[in-house]
Amino acid sequence: MIKKAIAKVVERIDLTEAEMIEVMDQIMSGGATPAQIAAFITALRMKGETVEEITGAARVMRDRATPIRVGKGVLDIDRDDINIDQETILDVVGTGGDGTNTFNISTTVSFVVASCGVKVAKHGNRAVSSACGSADVLESLGVNLDVTPETVEQAIAKIGIGFLFAPALHGAMKHAIGPRKEIGIRTIFNILGPLTNPAGADCQVLGVYREELVEPLARVLHKLGCRRGFVVHGMDGMDEITLTRETRIAEVTRDGVSVRTITPEEFGFASCPAGELRGGDAAGNARIVRGILEGATGPRRDVVLLNAAFGLVAAGKAVDPAEGVRIAAEAIDSGRALAKLEELITLTNE
């Protein structure tokens, strides 16, 4: 199938979702050669990936991931018949690769939101193009990443947050690692990670590195069965909701997708220079994260509150972002958010 797919894509012919599923199955089962994989993902990038192609690829990655079971079973958001007895699971994640070198905003947000009673399955990896990925900062904070899937499940069930370390749960990705490194360009795999949470997160705040990805990835989430979510891109380049400029945001509901532009001032925050949100290496970012959770004020806290607010709306814990900001601020000021970090450190090191 992959030979036929390459021939179509080089002629700028889009694949159907079913065709993409067949190709990705071949890639992730080891049935395609490195040369075929490299040719295919390069041609796909040059053509431009469609919503159907991304959706098909995401379905295969989800199916082949090691599942993280939450509640009574695996919450699979590819299915139409989602078990309504399952608890809401939220992921706050970005594609990375935005080049802005901010501190780990979504990781900090995850602890704030989890301390508000939302089950959080934080999906992430080590840094690829940035100085510090979510796995790097968590490790520096003292979280043990070398844990079993059962420990991750226990963390989500017991304390309300677990870290899903992508390399440990997406073993079938090994077949694409070599070709991806050797061609050295962004491909479909750069955007698939945030779409393939192994815990089947049914609510999501997804940051993307390019404005043009906002609406397409929102439509992918909708096709995959996302109950409520936001796909965001700061117009300063951030794969987060930013304080420096406007943010382009697509809201995903069961009814469809709507896109708009927001400003920090709408939610009571002053804009700030980009330098106020920058981070550093893992140790430096760990100090920033802990400082925010301990109550440090300023633009870094504000950007966490704003992003957490949309996470709380996605998870149904706030009716709107304004209420979400108030709830998130109280979670930090009460010490609950910091306590959530300490609980995860303790549980993963037992």
UniProtKB/Swiss-Prot annotation:
InterPro entries: Anthranilate_Pribosyl_Tfrase (IPR005940), Glycosyl_Trfase_fam3 (IPR000312), Glycosyl_Trfase_fam3_N_dom (IPR017459), Glycosyl_Trfase_fam3_N_dom_sf (IPR036320), Nuc_phospho_transferase (IPR035902). The lineage of its organism: Bacteria, Pseudomonadati, Thermodesulfobacteriota, Desulfuromonadia, Geobacterales. GO terms for cellular component: cytosol. Binds 2 magnesium ions per monomer. This is Anthranilate phosphoribosyltransferase. The keyword Protein biosynthesis does not apply. Its cofactor is Mg(2+). It catalyses: N-(5-phospho-beta-D-ribosyl)anthranilate + diphosphate = 5-phospho-alpha-D-ribose 1-diphosphate + anthranilate. It comes from Geobacter sulfurreducens (strain ATCC 51573 / DSM 12127 / PCA). Mg(2+) 2 binds at D239, E240. It is an enzyme of class 2 (transferase). One of its GO terms (molecular function) is magnesium ion binding. 5-phospho-alpha-D-ribose 1-diphosphate binds at residues 94, 97-98, 102, 104-107, 122-130, 134. Gene3D superfamilies: Nucleoside phosphorylase/phosphoribosyltransferase catalytic domain (3.40.1030.10), Transferase, Pyrimidine Nucleoside Phosphorylase, Chain C (1.20.970.10). It comes from the Bacteria. NCBIfam families: trpD (TIGR01245). One of its GO terms (biological process) is L-tryptophan biosynthetic process. PANTHER family: ANTHRANILATE PHOSPHORIBOSYLTRANSFERASE. Anthranilate 2 binds at R180. Pathway: Amino-acid biosynthesis; L-tryptophan biosynthesis; L-tryptophan from chorismate: step 2/5. Homodimer. Its EC number is 2.4.2.18. Keywords: Amino-acid biosynthesis, Aromatic amino acid biosynthesis, Glycosyltransferase, Magnesium, Metal-binding, Transferase, Tryptophan biosynthesis. Anthranilate 1 binds at G94, N125. Mg(2+) 1 binds at S106, E240. Catalyzes the transfer of the phosphoribosyl group of 5-phosphorylribose-1-pyrophosphate (PRPP) to anthranilate to yield N-(5'-phosphoribosyl)-anthranilate (PRA).
